[in-house]
Swiss-Prot record:
One of its GO terms (cellular component) is cytosol. The lineage of its organism: Bacteria, Bacillati, Bacillota, Bacilli, Bacillales. This is Translational regulator CsrA. Homodimer; the beta-strands of each monomer intercalate to form a hydrophobic core, while the alpha-helices form wings that extend away from the core. Coiled coil: none annotated. It holds the Pfam family CsrA. It comes from the Bacteria. Gene3D superfamilies: Translational regulator CsrA. InterPro entries: CsrA (IPR003751), CsrA_sf (IPR036107).
């Protein structure tokens, strides 16, 4: 993991298209702004993990449903 220090209003550039900027620092909370192309999904980590879990659950249900439907046709 690359660890960088930034101060208020400083940025980090990721590739050509993504900029992460420190917007404010209040106590132990840091607000960041992210500029990125619209086709790039940006989520908080806990939201991303929840989405992945839900997708895995849905995919599993789909496989089970397809198996059930397939066995009913036979």
């Amino acid at each position: 993991m690359l660890v960088l220090s930034r101060k208020l209003n400083q940025s980090i550039q990721i590739g050509d298209d993504i900029e992460v900027k420190i917007i404010s620092i209040e106590g132990d909370q840091v607000k960041i702004g992210i500029e990125a192309p619209k086709h790039i999904d940006i989520h908080r980590k806990e939201v991303y993990l929840s989405i992945q879990e839900e997708n895995n659950r849905a995919a599993s249900l789909s496989v089970d449903l397809l198996s059930q439907l397939s066995s009913q046709k036979k």
